[in-house]
Amino acid sequence: GSEMCIRDRLLAVVAFYLAFECLDWLSTRRIPFSEARFGRVWRVAHAVLSRHPFAGPFLVLMIAWAPTLIASLPGLFMGDTGAQIRQWFNYPNGTSDYLRLLNPNVLLNGHHPVVHTAIIGSCVQLGLSVFNSANAGLAIYTCAQFVITAACMAYSISSLRKFGVSMPVRGVALLFFAFMPMFSNYAALLTKDVFFADAFLVLLVQTVKLVACGLPRRDANAERVGEPRPVLFARHDWLLLVLGALGSTFLRNGGLVFPLAACVIAAAFCAWDAHAAHRAAKQDSAASTLRVPRLRWVGILAVLALCLVSNLSLIHI
């Protein structure tokens, strides 16, 4: 036992040493990733990561994760999964046995996020109604979660391009997500944590986008001359910010703290951008540069107010 422990520790130390040596070697001997040098490999990577920055990674993830989905159907259960399903159908479950319920005849409670319990319970109910099979309902939920998780991961990779991250780094990130079994297994896991992680990832990306709007940007996106520079925060990004904030709020008990922190941080940066734009407008006698940071600041406060009001409404229900 002790010999195996010592061996494992030595192997871990050697592995960390070799990993950092490899990183040092890559930093000193950087090979430019260009079309002239790599030809077909560069064109494939460019098509997947730059010409189709969202659809390309999304298809790669769906194809790479498909064997896990097929092997896992109707889904991988956690300890809480059965309890949530039984709650939705008002059957006795592990939480109803020890919680002091407001109404003993209503076993649905807030031990698990009620919104997620409603989602997975509704899918099972749909499977029973349409296909007369609870497994069919679980498969519907698993497939929907699988697609949404792949879409969120693909969106995070596509957003790296807007942040000026080079194509090789985005390619390595995509391959890591595609072939690390943890992510494909997680996408087929029937638990409340998966949808929350998806929503939190979108919220995190949108918050970084808002913060980065006022920062100088590296122009590392144009792999070919004449390519348009991507817009960092477009109109549809507000919808994604709302979805990420609401998802983080309702898919985790106490999850309101995450959009609260994100909106406060983003609002502080946007307020600073508005202050800087106001000073620049005084010097240049132009008010147009002041309008955009102020609108972003107001939009962030509106998203925060929406999360607060909707959370209070759910509590009263």
Task: List the predicted regions and their residue ranges.
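Specific aromatic-rich, kink-prone transmembrane helix
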Residues: 89, 155, 195-218, 245, ...
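Transmembrane-helix motifs of polytopic, lipid-linked glycan transferases
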Residues: 140-164, 202
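Multi-pass, polyprenyl lipid-linked donor-dependent membrane glycosyltransferases
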Residues: 78-82, 141-144, 172-207, 247-264
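Juxtamembrane membrane-water interface segments immediately following transmembrane helices
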Residues: 68, 72-89, 293-315
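Membrane-proximal lumenal/periplasmic loop motifs of glycosylation machinery
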Residues: 68-78, 89-149, 189
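Conserved small/polar residues in nucleotide/adenosyl-binding loops
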Residues: 3-9, 316-317
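Membrane-interface alpha helices of multi-pass inner-membrane proteins
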Residues: 237-253, 302-310
